[in-house]
């Protein structure tokens, strides 16, 4: 991963978007330079890496029933109130993803001309691996484009995006129609196939290096390690490619797309299982995976070539405190930006595993007692503790500090809750004793793939049928909930009560996905692929004395056509072959 950052910096100095369409400006390096300078060639590909959508947090939860923001200018807050249009779209990926694909296509068109190494065997291995990375990246970007821009046009056809496999130049025909969703999925899977031919499952894996070495005459251990060794961990690999295939199949099998996607739940389950089987199925689930963001020992001791067991693909580890500055409550010197909703709080079950609405142990006067441990870990509620001094935070409307409900516009909570997930509590924002800590962004967590498998397998085979694998949707739910401490005293009686009910299991799986992946950018898209209710108002909790009163905080104004995102308005205006999705 260090190598990517170096290359990106190098590429930033050498390339610009204009150079892709026009001859290089005098005194700048042209594309021909890459043929004798492999680092420059890698810089072209590195430009695609810099645009990865999962490299950070969008907090699009603010446009769902899971969160609001106290920032009136937050773009997700604005579109949730009815301001989402084809030319005001914070969910847009058209420009960034297509730009990445342009760099990928430019790289693929020139990679065979590059002198990758003096040794011919090493040079061929490098060329094949770099091209495989490019194919994997292009498959990934197709997934993100489909998630954000696929939809039904006015003629009732489910369309994807234009499929681009050659670099565009000044004389190219830019007025290219969208391809069908089916054809886009075929293109994605063909790119994935080409990627898997040249990539190891993971860099440095002995068996994988031996497999790849067999393709090249004269490839000894030293040469193979040079090309496929641990130095390249963090770049596109076989397991990352397969994970994106699983994500794409889950999207395509979902209600919003399944009528015309050509992908069913069995396919989606098989794709997820292919990833999970490499870690031993449910036995490979990380017991501490639900607190990956604050497992201090794991994070502090993480080397550039390692990832915790929970993490399939991650970004760089770096010291920072920006997340905490944005989201710590005011008395901890934060801005309290992301405020979880009562809707989300209600989604966390009781410690015994039963939903709040079905549990005799739930006490409206003590609503946070005997709850799912993930509630305390992910959401800071009234009386909860936070920060490196373990300070008690009071969010009640009659509170005396700036942490109180609506106390200070733009800083205090609007729902009665503050964000806790993703934040390091051992950070200090005190101006007199500031202390940052290491963070990293998980691009893909194994928990996401477990949840994808559970959802697809339940729909394909039912809760307990394993569908040819060694584990079922029920098995995943049992393990996932148990690791968080749910139902340990009663054998998770609620799960046992629904293990033969496909509909109730589907509801539970969706709820577990909501909890486990909250604030990581999933629910905005999940609600759409499920065709769920988009207009449930965001609620909060007004606490005064011992009285807890639920309240409405923000309405959600979305129309039914907004299950699918728009094609950018400017693009539709420029190109008449580019058909807009219905309603936009």
What are these language model-derived features?
Residues 37-43, 50, 74-151, 169-186, ...:
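Conserved, well-structured interaction surfaces
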Residues 141-150, 245-257, 448-462, 484:
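Extended, well-ordered alpha-helical segments in internal regulatory regions
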Residues 115-128, 256-264, 461-472:
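Structural helix-adjacent loops and short alpha-helical linkers that scaffold large soluble proteins
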Residues 368, 373-480:
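C-terminal substrate/ligand-recognition segments
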Residues 97-100, 182, 187-189, 209-223, ...:
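Long, intrinsically disordered, low-complexity segments
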Residues 1-27:
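Bacterial Sec-dependent N-terminal signal peptides
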Residues 18-77, 96, 131, 150-161, ...:
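An aromatic- and glycine-enriched ligand-binding surface/loop that stacks and positions planar moieties
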């Amino acid at each position: 991963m260090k190598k990517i950052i170096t290359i990106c910096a190098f590429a930033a100095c050498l390339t610009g978007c204009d150079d892709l369409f026009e001859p290089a400006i005098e005194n700048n390096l042209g594309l021909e330079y890459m043929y004798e300078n492999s680092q420059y060639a890698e810089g072209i590909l590195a430009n695609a890496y810099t645009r990865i959508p999962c490299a950070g947090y969008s907090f699009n939860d603010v446009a769902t029933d899971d969160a609001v923001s106290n920032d009136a200018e937050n773009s997700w807050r604005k579109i949730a109130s009815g301001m989402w249009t084809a030319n005001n779209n914070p969910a847009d990926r058209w420009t960034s993803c297509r730009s990445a694909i342009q760099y990928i296509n430019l790289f693929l068109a020139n990679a065979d001309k590059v002198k990758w190494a003096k040794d011919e065997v090493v040079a061929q291995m490098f060329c094949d691996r770099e091209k495989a990375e490019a194919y994997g990246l292009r498959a990934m970007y197709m997934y993100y484009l489909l998630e954000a821009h696929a939809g039904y046009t006015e003629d009732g056809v489910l369309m994807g995006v234009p499929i681009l496999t050659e670099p565009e130049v000044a004389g190219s025909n830019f007025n290219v129609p969208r391809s069908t969703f089916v054809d886009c999925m075929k293109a994605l899977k063909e790119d994935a196939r080409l990627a898997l031919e040249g990539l190891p499952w993971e860099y440095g894996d002995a068996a994988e290096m031996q497999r790849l070495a067999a393709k090249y005459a004269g490839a000894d251990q030293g040469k193979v390690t040079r090309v496929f060794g641990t130095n390249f961990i963090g770049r596109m690999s076989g397991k990352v490619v397969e994970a994106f295939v699983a994500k794409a199949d889950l999207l395509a099998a979902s209600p919003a797309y399944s009528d015309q996607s050509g992908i069913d739940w069995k396919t989606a389950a098989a794709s997820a299982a292919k990833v999970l089987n490499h870690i031993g199925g449910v036995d490979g689930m990380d017991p501490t995976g639900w607190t990956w963001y604050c497992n201090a020992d794991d994070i502090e001791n993480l080397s550039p070539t390692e990832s915790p067991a929970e993490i399939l693909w991650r970004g760089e580890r770096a010291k920072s405190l920006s997340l905490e500055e944005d989201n710590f409550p005011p008395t901890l010197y934060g801005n309290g930006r992301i405020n979880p909703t009562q809707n989300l709080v209600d989604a966390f079950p009781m410690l015994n595993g039963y939903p709040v609405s079905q549990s005799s142990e739930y006490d409206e006067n003590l609503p946070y007692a005997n709850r799912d441990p993930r509630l305390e870990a992910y959401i800071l509620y009234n009386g909860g503790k936070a920060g490196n001094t373990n300070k008690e935070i009071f969010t009640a409307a009659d509170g005396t500090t700036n942490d109180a409900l609506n106390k200070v516009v733009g800083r205090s909570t609007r729902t009665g809750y503050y964000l806790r997930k993703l934040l390091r509590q051992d950070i200090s924002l005190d101006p007199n004793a500031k202390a940052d800590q290491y963070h990293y962004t998980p691009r893909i967590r194994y928990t996401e793939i477990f949840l994808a498998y559970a959802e697809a397998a339940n729909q394909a085979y039912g809760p307990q049928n394993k569908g040819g694998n060694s584990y079922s949707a029920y098995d995943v739910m049992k393990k996932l909930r148990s690791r968080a401490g749910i139902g340990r005293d009663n054998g998770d009686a609620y799960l046992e009560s629904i293990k033969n009910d496909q509909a109730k299991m589907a509801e539970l799986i969706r709820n577990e996905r909501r909890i486990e992946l909250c604030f990581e950018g999933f629910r905005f898209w999940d609600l759409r692929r499920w065709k769920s209710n988009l207009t449930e108002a965001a609620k909060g909790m007004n606490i005064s004395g011992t009285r807890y009163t639920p309240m409405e905080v923000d309405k959600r104004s979305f129309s039914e056509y907004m299950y699918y995102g728009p094609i950018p308005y400017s693009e539709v205006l420029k190109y008449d072959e580019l058909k807009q999705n219905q309603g936009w």
